[in-house]
Swiss-Prot record:
The modification Phosphoserine is found at S48, S57, S75. The gene is SRA1. It comes from Homo sapiens (Human). PANTHER family: STEROID RECEPTOR RNA ACTIVATOR 1. Appears to be the first example of a new class of functional RNAs also able to encode a protein. Coiled coil: none annotated. Belongs to the SRA1 family. Gene3D superfamilies: Functional domain of the splicing factor Prp18 (1.20.940.10). This is Steroid receptor RNA activator 1. GO terms for cellular component: cilium; cytoplasm; cytosol; intercellular bridge; intracellular membrane-bounded organelle; microtubule cytoskeleton; nucleoplasm; nucleus.
Length: 224
């Protein structure tokens, strides 16, 4: 290819004359050649050295924790119910026994004993129950005493005499200053009601035995 770009030397010149390049052959073979020089950016007028764009372009700021919110947390509006599917937390509330629920069974037990117990004993029990009602209505009894009395009445109504007597003793030990004036009557009422129940049970058993003894055998006729 070198011979296409070089013309033979001038015969009239010396042997060491340099060859002459043909510009026309160069343009025909390769076309216009691009200049390898790049454009230079003019220097800034203020005279400060120019920094490449890659060094001056700021990157994204570092991510830090979000700033605290200046707004206080808003409470839910009044009257708004809980979210669906979530039940409100229920706190156990200590229920207080009702005075009528305790006194009514005791008075009924006293009425059952009348006619089977001496009048003096029944009158003393009635007076003690009146003191119990007075102190209860006056707010002089604590919640533990009221709750134990409710349990005592349940055991008494169910004819569980030993359990009722155990509750009576626990009240005398733990709350003697509250119950000493009327608990004696409750204790006597438990004993009288227990005795009456045992007597009634014995009478029923005796009556059943007598009825069985006097029962006529089917098909058997006594001689007239």
């Amino acid at each position: 290819m070198a011979e296409l770009y070089v013309k033979p030397g001038n015969k009239e010149r010396g042997w060491n004359d340099p060859p002459q390049f043909s510009y026309g052959l160069q343009t025909q073979a390769g076309g216009p050649r691009r200049s390898l020089l790049t454009k230079r950016v003019a220097a800034p007028q203020d005279g400060s050295p120019r920094v490449p764009a890659s060094e001056t372009s700021p990157g994204p700021p570092p991510m830090g924790p979000p700033p605290p919110s200046s707004k206080a947390p808003r409470s839910p509006p009044v009257g708004s119910g809980p979210a669906s599917g979530v039940e409100p937390t229920s706190f156990p509330v200590e229920s207080e026994a009702v005075m009528e629920d305790v006194l009514r069974p005791l008075e009924q037990a006293l009425e059952d004993c009348r006619g089977h117990t001496r009048k003096q004993v029944c009158d003393d029990i009635s007076r003690r129950l009146a003191l119990l009602q007075e102190q209860w209505a006056g707010g002089k009894l604590s919640i533990p005493v009221k709750k134990r009395m409710a349990l005592l009445v349940q055991e008494l109504s169910s004819h569980r005499w030993d359990a009722a007597d155990d509750i009576h003793r626990s009240l005398m030990v733990d709350h003697v200053t509250e119950v000493s004036q009327w608990m004696v009557g409750v204790k006597r009422l438990i004993a009288e009601k227990r005795s009456l129940f045992s007597e009634e049970a014995a009478n029923e058993e005796k009556s059943a035995a007598t009825a069985e003894k006097n029962h006529t055998i089917p098909g058997f006729q006594q001689a007239s």
